[in-house]
Design a protein with these regions (language model features):
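Hot-dog-fold acyl-thioester-processing enzymes
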Residues: 1-24
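Surface-exposed beta-strand edges and their flanking turn/coil or helix-capping segments
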Residues: 5-9, 43-45, 70
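Residue-identity detector for glutamine
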Residues: 10, 27, 35, 72-73
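A conserved acidic, glycine/proline-rich C-terminal tail/linker
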Residues: 21-54
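HotDog/MaoC-like acyl-thioester-processing domains
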Residues: 37-38, 47-73
Length: 73
């Protein structure tokens, strides 16, 4: 945007890049923690859960910008 924030939809697109290629998304939930700016580095942290994955995009100190949960049916 005009303030150089990362668009909320872009977080989800970035997180989806870390899912296995054959993973079919049935449900998605994003929890936004803080804003990232244009030149911020987003470090992915991926955890396998019972019915899918949680992808957390974090800053260099490990603080989350967003956690996105992707579930299969």
């Amino acid at each position: 945007d005009t303030n150089h924030h990362v668009n909320n939809g872009q977080y989800v697109n970035i997180a989806m890049e870390y899912l296995p290629g054959d993973f079919l998304i049935h449900q998605m939930r994003a929890v936004y923690k803080k804003q990232a700016f244009l030149d911020d580095m987003l470090h992915p942290y991926v955890v396998s859960v019972e019915s899918g994955y949680v992808v957390s995009l974090r800053d260099e100190e490990g603080r989350p910008y967003v956690s996105v949960e992707f579930l299969q049916q």
